[in-house]
Each structure stands twice: as C-alpha cells, then as structure tokens.
From Swiss-Prot:
<feature type="compositionally biased region" description="Basic residues">
    <location>
        <begin position="118"/>
        <end position="137"/>
    </location>
</feature>
<comment type="similarity">
    <text>Belongs to the universal ribosomal protein uS9 family.</text>
</comment>
<dbReference type="InterPro" id="IPR020568">
    <property type="entry name" value="Ribosomal_Su5_D2-typ_SF"/>
</dbReference>
<dbReference type="GO" id="GO:0003735">
    <property type="term" value="F:structural constituent of ribosome"/>
</dbReference>
<feature type="compositionally biased region" description="Basic and acidic residues">
    <location>
        <begin position="105"/>
        <end position="117"/>
    </location>
</feature>
<dbReference type="InterPro" id="IPR023035">
    <property type="entry name" value="Ribosomal_uS9_bac/plastid"/>
</dbReference>
<dbReference type="GO" id="GO:0006412">
    <property type="term" value="P:translation"/>
</dbReference>
<dbReference type="InterPro" id="IPR020574">
    <property type="entry name" value="Ribosomal_uS9_CS"/>
</dbReference>
<dbReference type="InterPro" id="IPR014721">
    <property type="entry name" value="Ribsml_uS5_D2-typ_fold_subgr"/>
</dbReference>
<feature type="region of interest" description="Disordered">
    <location>
        <begin position="105"/>
        <end position="137"/>
    </location>
</feature>
<keyword id="KW-0689">Ribosomal protein</keyword>
<keyword id="KW-0687">Ribonucleoprotein</keyword>
<protein>
    <recommendedName>
        <fullName>Small ribosomal subunit protein uS9</fullName>
    </recommendedName>
</protein>
<dbReference type="GO" id="GO:0003723">
    <property type="term" value="F:RNA binding"/>
</dbReference>
<dbReference type="Pfam" id="PF00380">
    <property type="entry name" value="Ribosomal_S9"/>
</dbReference>
<dbReference type="InterPro" id="IPR000754">
    <property type="entry name" value="Ribosomal_uS9"/>
</dbReference>
<dbReference type="GO" id="GO:0022627">
    <property type="term" value="C:cytosolic small ribosomal subunit"/>
</dbReference>
C-alpha cells in the first residue's frame, strides 16, 4: 500500500555531469532533505558548508529549499565535481517541474554544463603540457 502512495508522488528527474562525475537527481515533494547514495547530504559531503550550498543553490534561488527532498545517485570524480554535478541535475529537474523556472536558473548560470575537464597526457611529455627540460647543448 505504501509503495503505491510513494509511486504516485510527483518525481522530477535531472542528470548532471561535471569533470568525471555523474549525478542522477530526483526531486520529490518533501521537507528539503538531501540524500546522496543513501546517506544524508551533510555526511556524504563531509559537513562542508560550501559543497552543501553548491548542491542546494538552484532550490534556494527559487525559494523552494523546504518544499522538495533531493535524492541523488552519484558516481565518479571527487566531492567538488559531484557537488557541481548535483547542482546541474537539480536545476534540470526544476525545469522539468515548471518550465517557468528555466529563465531565472539560466540567468544564475545553473543550467550551464561546465565543459572543463582534465586534459589527457601526451606521449613525449611529462603531463598534458609539461615538457621535459630542454638543453641546448
């Protein structure tokens, strides 16, 4: 009986990516709790207020931080990339919730996928661009 009630609740889905992180985000009507990979958001993001603020930023900009629970499955990368990928996923889910949300989120920059990623190492070099020391003689 409870499963039927839970499946009837409106769920909004968004996917976010940043560096090598991928976050699959679900917004469910609730009290504003953040759950990442089955853990509380505070615990998963190591109680770092910056990461928590980044992840919840799109909801706060629209004044909906206490209206929806954020359920996230994330993998790859580190905490910074995961927090940014969660932010993009939440913003995309909010656009699905109401197309009117798109413009304010776009102005804030929450719908922009950050294309910066680690550049591959090239052969003959020590890193992506660092060359071995050059000796003229």
């Amino acid at each position: 009986m409870q499963l039927v009630e839970q499946s009837k609740r409106a769920t909004y889905i968004g996917t976010g990516r940043r560096k090598s992180s991928v976050a699959r985000v679900r917004l469910v009507p609730g009290t504003g709790q953040l759950t990442i990979n089955g853990k509380s958001g505070e615990l998963y993001l190591q109680f770092n207020p910056t990461y928590l603020a980044i992840a919840k930023a799109p909801l706060e900009s629209l004044g909906l931080e206490n209206d929806y629970d954020i359920l996230v499955n994330t993998s790859g990368g580190g905490l910074t990339g995961q927090a940014d990928s969660i932010r993009l996923g939440v913003a995309r889910a909010l656009c699905q919730l109401d197309p009117e949300n798109r413009k304010p989120l776009k102005v804030e920059g929450y719908l922009t996928r950050d294309p910066r990623a680690k550049e591959r190492k090239k052969y003959g070099l020590r890193k992506a661009r660092k060359a071995p020391q050059y000796s003229k003689r």
